[in-house]
Amino acid sequence: MKPIKVLIIDDSALIRSLLREMITSDPRLEVCGAAEDPYQAREMIKQLNPHVLTLDIEMPRMNGISFLKNLMRLHPLPVVMISTLTQVGAPETLEALSLGAVDFIGKPKQHSDLGLSQYRDEIIRKLICAAGANVTAMEGVGKAKATGLDAVAQSKSLKTGFLCAIGASTGGTEAIKAVVSSLPLNSPPIVVTQHIPPAFSTSFAKRLDGASAVKVYEAQHQQPIEKGCVYIAPGDAHLKVSKTAKGYICLLDSGEMVNRHRPSVEVLFDSVCEQVGNKAMGVILTGMGADGAEALKRMRDAGSHTIAQDEATSIVWGMPGAAVKLDAAAEVLPLNKVAANIIKHALK
């Protein structure tokens, strides 16, 4: 098999050199070029036909966001953003994902907590995943918002004790937005785990809240779970659901990583299965790996309705694909049908 051709776009010579060294350490990848600004990158894309790009957000002459807008319009390619994993960098990175970037990773730092060897493993994994991503699905995500659910939801009342849990990873920020922004005010309570860094979950929840009729929160420990509300797991804690005499509440757990993740979809789904039982619904959306697939099967076996996003509309059909292989999903649906299905099963 021919190696995946990677084009690095970064104005720092040091970062370009570090990335090149790490990427070329894996025989499945080959650095076909390194550009110091988007203008140079534009010419290199024409000449070298890379399979995937790494793109810095902050660059002179033209920033990464402007370049990404043009690229996705004229020559869509899988892109992994190299961004500052801070609250300051979060809005720009989330915007890059909304414009069609597949994934993001922090900048390599020689003295970071995440050692360079761990960073190398992560960027290699993300580049290989991005190279196989469904770029045409990216174009459809923004159009996946469902309409007309208000009238349906207003005509009936919600089932008592019903709760929906959603899990996602790569491509998930936009897939979750497509689902949540389609929901009417009369929606069931929804809990969400998206693999995201700690500094990003607050921005993600705010961004979703601004785009939706329902109220979206970054989940707090012991926060009551109410209808018409969506609760997003913080980037450094597992989100669990607990049943109390007054109703469901959110619990946050900073314990060990599960399936290499904290928050983990598996942890959320298992707690929902245990606490909500057959009144729950489980939804697994686009994402790399298999986090949540086995727990979704346990939810289905316990009598919950379960959904996996279909391959055609998934950026990466890892997690939903794993769920389908395990027969964990009662239905496999395109992204634009998920919100309506949640409402259908939530109403009496």
Swiss-Prot record:
It is found in: Cytoplasm. The keyword Cell inner membrane does not apply. Residues 157-348 form the CheB-type methylesterase domain. Pfam families: CheB_methylest, Response_reg. The modification 4-aspartylphosphate is found at residue 56. Its main location: cytoplasm. It comes from the Bacteria. One of its GO terms (biological process) is chemotaxis. Keywords: Chemotaxis, Cytoplasm, Hydrolase, Phosphoprotein. Phosphorylated by CheA. Phosphorylation of the N-terminal regulatory domain activates the methylesterase activity. Its EC number is 3.1.1.61, 3.5.1.44. Coiled coil: none annotated. Gene3D superfamilies: 3.40.50.2300, Methylesterase CheB, C-terminal domain (3.40.50.180). It catalyses: [protein]-L-glutamate 5-O-methyl ester + H2O = L-glutamyl-[protein] + methanol + H(+); L-glutaminyl-[protein] + H2O = L-glutamyl-[protein] + NH4(+). One of its GO terms (molecular function) is phosphorelay response regulator activity. Belongs to the CheB family. Contains a C-terminal catalytic domain, and an N-terminal region which modulates catalytic activity. Involved in chemotaxis. Part of a chemotaxis signal transduction system that modulates chemotaxis in response to various stimuli. Catalyzes the demethylation of specific methylglutamate residues introduced into the chemoreceptors (methyl-accepting chemotaxis proteins or MCP) by CheR. Also mediates the irreversible deamidation of specific glutamine residues to glutamic acid. NCBIfam families: PRK00742.1, PRK12555.1. This is Protein-glutamate methylesterase/protein-glutamine glutaminase 2. It comes from Saccharophagus degradans (strain 2-40 / ATCC 43961 / DSM 17024).
